[in-house]
UniProtKB/Swiss-Prot annotation:
Similarity field: Belongs to the FrhB family.
Organism: Methanosarcina barkeri (strain Fusaro / DSM 804)
Subunit structure of this chain's protein: Pentamer of two alpha chains, two beta chains and a gamma chain.
Enzyme Commission no: 1.12.98.1
Record InterPro entries: Co_F420_Hydgase/DH_bsu_N, FRHB/FDHB/HCAR-like, FrhB_archaea, FrhB_FdhB_C
GO terms, molecular function: coenzyme F420 hydrogenase activity; flavin adenine dinucleotide binding; iron-sulfur cluster binding; nickel cation binding; oxidoreductase activity, acting on CH or CH2 groups, with an iron-sulfur protein as acceptor
Taxonomy of the source species: Archaea, Methanobacteriati, Methanobacteriota, Stenosarchaea group, Methanomicrobia
Listed name of the protein: Coenzyme F420 hydrogenase subunit beta
Top EC class, one word: oxidoreductase
Function field: Reduces the physiological low-potential two-electron acceptor coenzyme F420, and the artificial one-electron acceptor methylviologen.
Catalytic activity: oxidized coenzyme F420-(gamma-L-Glu)(n) + H2 + H(+) = reduced coenzyme F420-(gamma-L-Glu)(n)
Swiss-Prot/TrEMBL cofactor(s): Ni(2+); iron-sulfur cluster; FAD
Keywords: Iron, Iron-sulfur, Metal-binding, Oxidoreductase
Disulphide bond pairs: none
Length: 291
């Protein structure tokens, strides 16, 4: 087991992409999260998974329980807005009758899952049914109205015309169905961030079974951390079955140096906010869960 102060504990780390062309068509990068949940479902590791599906408005995520390949594929791609995934844990087990639940989410949501497993207050047997978690790299997230302001007021694009968004190279990128590409400097988006993101001390979803994101890998590929016994079992079997193409992370650019740099920046910046808030009398609620 490798331990890194900024990247957490992990068994191994690789650069990878799905070999499924259908998944890659609308995947954010290497299609890792989607492909993993499809594979886990088809191989019986999970009965279904909680995903960020399509809401009632353009690019508004909505938590859903996906129980088929098609339902998982509908949730492909990143939606840069808040989706309360964990609120659906009870729904997944009680209304849908799932005994082995998959959960995909960002860092704070992985932390919530692990807290529920340690302290299952008002959850009864639900946490024991979480079978597999895939965590996403996350620097910050935006309320829906904030996302709308970034796209429409700063990028000057209609949210309904957008086919993809991404955050990379210091900019918020917006791609439209007609081929337009607009960018917004990240310094202009900071005021729109969810305030809770400013006390988050995790960038790479340390507490997930497997965590993934684009940073560190070439375009069209994703960086993948295998973190737990469950994650290693599913990943090893999936790779052996030809579900992923992989490269050693040491052989790709920009590699872990950039990922570690960004993780360090987030943690150190947010730790300052945590220390400041301690003076407000809320120190007990801001204990570092990774310490």
């Amino acid at each position: 087991m490798i331990e890194d102060p900024y990247l957490g504990k992990y068994v191994t780390c690789v650069s990878a992409r799905s070999t499924d062309k259908e998944i890659l068509k609308k995947a954010q990068d290497g299609g890792i999260a989607t492909a993993l949940m499809v594979y886990a479902l088809e191989e019986g590791f999970i009965d279904g998974t909680i995903v960020a599906g399509e809401g009632d408005k353009p690019w508004q995520p909505k938590p859903e329980v996906a129980m088929t390949r098609e339902e998982i594929l509908k949730a492909r791609g990143t939606r840069y807005s808040i989706s309360p995934q964990i609120s659906w844990l009870k729904e997944a087990t009680r209304s849908f009758g799932l005994d082995k639940v998959g959960v995909t989410g960002v860092c704070c949501q992985m932390q919530a899952v692990r807290k529920a497993q340690l302290y299952p207050i008002n959850m009864r047997d639900v946490p024991g049914k979480v079978a597999f978690t895939v965590g996403l790299f996350c620097m910050e997230n935006f309320p829906y109205k904030s996302l709308q302001s970034i796209v429409e007021d700063h990028a000057n694009q209609s949210l309904g015309s957008v086919k993809k968004m991404e955050i990379t190279k210091g900019k918020f990128w917006v791609y439209t169905e007609r081929g337009n590409v607009a960018t917004v400097p990240l310094k202009a988006t900071h005021k729109y961030e969810q305030p809770g993101c400013h006390v988050c001390l995790d960038y790479v979803s340390n507490l997930a079974d497997i965590s993934t994101g684009s940073v560190g890998s070439p375009d069209g590929w994703s960086t993948v951390f295998i973190r737990t016994k469950v994650g290693n079992e599913i990943w090893s079997k999936a790779v052996a079955d030809g579900m992923f193409e992989t490269k050693p992370i040491e052989e790709v650019k920009p590699g872990l140096d950039l990922l570690r740099k960004l993780a360090k920046e987030k943690i150190e910046k947010n730790q300052k906010t945590v220390e400041e808030r301690k003076t407000f009398g809320v120190n007990k609620g801001l204990r570092n869960p990774y310490a």
